Amino acid sequence: MHKKKHIKHGTNKQEIINIGTKSPTFQEKQRPSKTDQRSTVWREEQKKQELKVHRIFHPQPRTGFDVGKGIDPWLTTWQMITVILATLCIILVTKVGFLIPSLFSKGEKQSRKFSLLDPLCDRNDDSSCDFCSSDWIAFGNNFYCVFRENSKTWVESQSACEELNSHLVIIDSKAEVENLLLFEMDGWILHRMDGTNSSRLWGNDIKIRNTLMNDSEKKNHSCHYLRGNIFMPDECSAKKTYICEFNI
């Protein structure tokens, strides 16, 4: 009897517990409230925002490799820069290759050009030194200068050269003519018609222009000036540029 009562009593307790858990009031207590749900959502949003801010101020080191595409953007950029620099280097080398020969040719011309004729200036007063300018050109032991600003007669030209302890240029070789042609020197020269054909000295490149003249004209046209590779006879009273020569 006592056992049965005990069993019944335990059964009643279990039923009470089961009934209590199944009751609506108990289930409502077990469910999270709306306030708790909102706070949970807010915390999750706050964590997301904090994570974004952290990524902005503390970015992860770039690996430089896109796993999906298999392409390294940094490598591509450096390849483009390398190609551009290589192209520029090739262009510069090409330009330098074209410039060097021209510089050497200019240097050769400058080496044939003399500098100031200091020995000539030392022998004259200051006024005479005005004639000594960078127009003087050296060729071997000879210095030449063409005066283009003040045209003079043949006699005046010779006198002007003598004031500089020089004389009108005397051409006695083909090389000397080539030197004068190189620097485009035209003017009175110290050459007179003496019945000889001076062109034999220099071959067919140098020509003496002969014209039909009577005896009186020959006297008046006994002076010559150089124009290009041609000796031109003309009246000695004509005013032209002149070329002075100084020998050391």
From Swiss-Prot:
The chain crosses the membrane at residues 80-100. Glycans are attached at N197, N214, N220. Residues 1-79 are cytoplasmic. It is a single-pass type II membrane protein. Its main location: membrane. Residues 19-44 are annotated as: Disordered. Residues 139-245 form the C-type lectin domain. Residues 101-248 are extracellular. Disulfide bonds join C132-C145, C161-C244, C223-C236. It is found in: Cell membrane. Keywords: Cell membrane, Disulfide bond, Glycoprotein, Lectin, Membrane, Receptor, Signal-anchor, Transmembrane, Transmembrane helix. InterPro entries: C-type_lectin-like, C-type_lectin-like/link_sf, CTDL_fold, NKG2/CD94_NK_receptors, NKR-like_CTLD. GO terms for molecular function: carbohydrate binding. It comes from the Eukaryota. GO terms for cellular component: plasma membrane. Residues 28-44 have a biased composition (Basic and acidic residues). Expressed in natural killer (NK) cells. Heterodimer with KLRE1. Lectin-like receptor for natural killer (NK) cells. Heterodimer formation with KLRE1 mediates NK cell cytolytic activity. This is Killer cell lectin-like receptor subfamily I member 2. It comes from Mus musculus (Mouse).
